[in-house]
Amino acid sequence: QDMRTALLDLYRELDAYQDARPALDAVYKAGLPAAVLSNGNQQMLNHAFAAAGLTDRLDSLLSVEDVGVFKPDPRVYQLGCDRYQVRAEEILFVSSNGWDAAAAGLFGFKTIWENRAGMPVERLPSHPDFIAPSLDFISEHLSTGSASTRS
């Protein structure tokens, strides 16, 4: 139990990648809402994003706790539509997990797979709309209005 608690405490204190803040700043400056949609619980999300200093750029921290199932269940992705009262195709979903981007794409979101490690595209029933090596892609895309890394 002590090891589990120690690991969870470390997870709550993870530093954000250096490109996270500039990407969220770009979204904010563009007048767009930004949210996190996570399999984590609400308490963990609140603590982790406060510790990373990013909550001032996030409109919502959405947890699967609200629906009682985990991604890739479509009810989880529906949380984003319900929160912002938009259609799925109006949401741009960014994930560092290929399976998560694939499931979000099947749900109807436009997707970016943030693939820092340069992993090969997995054989999944859907592929991301964009593949980017970092979150800098978001800042660049919002400032130029074009995408340079098409999948």
Regions found by a protein language model. Give the residues of each.
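Short, acidic loop-to-helix structural element flanking the phosphoryl-transfer center
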Residues: 2-36, 46, 74
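Asp-based, Mg2+/Mn2+-dependent phosphohydrolase catalytic module
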Residues: 25, 37, 41-42, 46-151
